[in-house]
Amino acid sequence: AMAISDNIIIMNKGVVAQMGTPEEIYYHPVDEFVADFIGEANFLKGKCSTIDGKYAVLDFEGKKLTVPLREGGMEKGKDYTAVLRPEAAKLGDEGGLECKVEVSCFMGSYQNYHVKIGDTLIKLEDHNPKNRKVYKQGETCSLLIDTDSLHVL
């Protein structure tokens, strides 16, 4: 549907959940159902601790996760969920959120990873593994997230 449509409608239990272009729905889903329905999604849940300009900080699994401000604003002390698509992050040796590699699998055109931060499992796809270090199961590394690629629900 996404490849041949100008607009699509996502329905949940017979009710329109979201209508828009494929890009709008993929990058700006209205809720977890739509985000999960339209593609692979990771849900990073945390409490807002800081708001500064266009960004906020969520306390996520004991770490600080910078996110773009949600449309309509955000409030300190309130719980939010940030949607992270598997292709919107990569692994590195430092500079991000410390994580542990649970799964590392070469898939041909990409390296598939499952990493854990606290109790949260995060799925990643590194679409250029030949030019980067490949992390193995059991290794500790750093999850590098492009802040502006996150979408806060």
Describe the residue ranges of each PLM region.
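Non-catalytic connector elements of ABC transporters
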Residues: A41, I51-L153
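Internal alpha/beta loop-helix hairpins
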Residues: M2-K63
